[in-house]
Regions:
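Structural preference for alpha-helix termini/caps and helix-kink/transition segments
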Residues: 1-165
Length: 165
């Protein structure tokens, strides 16, 4: 079975996320589409964890308490993940919060989302400047160069963020 997961491009952490999405006392039927959804959720969490290198952290103490409350309620991991899902929309984690998530869920978010190099940060700043100056050819070339390093840029109205591809 596990070799089937690997053969289909999934990792052990994708499977772990799938397991965490259900309650340990409930029976579940496995499907690759559900596993793909779990992988996407894990990707969302990784992108959330990567924000800690880009913006000031917000206070996540209430979120932490809500996650712990769910986990202390008969190990309700699905409920704990739902609390995290609500939080990722409007918050930025600290390193401490990402480490807490790794302790709670074992998803290796800190390990899989290291800070990018100073060279890449400089290229991102250069691209932002080129975009501000409306030099779209240079901006596009820099975006493509940055993408070759496995980093996707997200252009917002007031900011430019990055995430791992």
């Amino acid at each position: 079975m596990f070799s089937d997961l690997i053969a289909n491009g999934f990792s052990h952490l994708d499977y772990k996320m799938w397991v965490l999405q259900g309650h340990f006392q409930s029976e579940r039927n496995f499907s690759f589409s559900d596993l793909a959804a779990a992988r996407q959720r894990l990707t969302n969490y990784r992108n959330f964890a990567a924000l800690r290198w880009q913006k000031p952290a917000t206070d996540m103490s209430e979120v932490r308490a809500a996650i712990l409350e769910q986990l202390n309620n008969n190990l309700n991991s699905a409920g704990a993940l739902a609390e995290l899902d609500k939080a990722i929309k409007n918050n930025v984690p600290s390193n401490e919060f990402v480490e807490f998530l790794d302790e709670a869920f074992g998803l290796k978010l800190a390990e899989s989302t290291p800070d990018i190099s100073d060279e890449l940060k400089a290229k991102i700043a250069e691209r932002k400047q080129a975009k501000t100056e409306r030099d779209f050819a240079k901006s596009d070339a820099l975006r493509d160069e940055i993408a070759e390093s496995g980093i996707k840029l997200l252009d917002g109205a007031n900011e430019m963020l990055w995430q791992y591809e």
